[in-house]
């Protein structure tokens, strides 16, 4: 294990996106496995891999297939807030294939990625453990996501 990182989620600014991420992470939101079509309410992110890692740019995960095209069996609309930007390393943002195609895939930045503003929903930022993010390699597993309120 590379270690842990801690992130703050911006529930007050992008509530639908955070509710989706938290619901999948905790297993309270139903999702459909992209291969088996089985419906589940288990913690979605536990055990998934970071299938896309570009050094000096981002790490991306959230596909149960580990290939980059799987998701939870639904999409939801983009949710943008003017104060949330890709303006630092450690930004958590939804990966998508265009407007309105958010599902479960997310990425965490290594650098400022301002060209992604208005295209990908920012929903959190890393508070501790950016070194863990920066050292993550393609295929590394996300053991679990723990949600807590502080």
Feature map (PLM): residue ranges:
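Cyclophilin-like peptidyl-prolyl cis-trans isomerases
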Residues: 1-150
């Amino acid at each position: 294990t590379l270690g842990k990182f801690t992130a703050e989620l911006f529930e007050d600014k992008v509530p639908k996106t955070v509710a989706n991420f938290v619901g999948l992470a905790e297993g309270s939101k139903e999702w459909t496995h992209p291969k088996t079509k089985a419906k589940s309410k288990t913690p979605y992110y536990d055990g998934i891999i970071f299938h896309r890692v570009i050094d000096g740019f981002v790490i991306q995960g959230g596909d149960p297939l580990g290939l980059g095209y799987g998701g939870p069996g639904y999409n939801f609309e983009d949710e943008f807030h003017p104060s949330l930007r890709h303006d630092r390393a450690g930004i958590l943002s939804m990966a998508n294939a265009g407007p309105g195609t958010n599902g479960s895939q997310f990425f965490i930045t290594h650098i400022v990625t301002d060209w992604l503003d208005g295209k990908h929903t920012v929903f959190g930022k890393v508070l501790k453990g950016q070194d863990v993010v920066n050292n993550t390699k393609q295929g590394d597993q996300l053991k679990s996501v723990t949600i807590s309120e502080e």
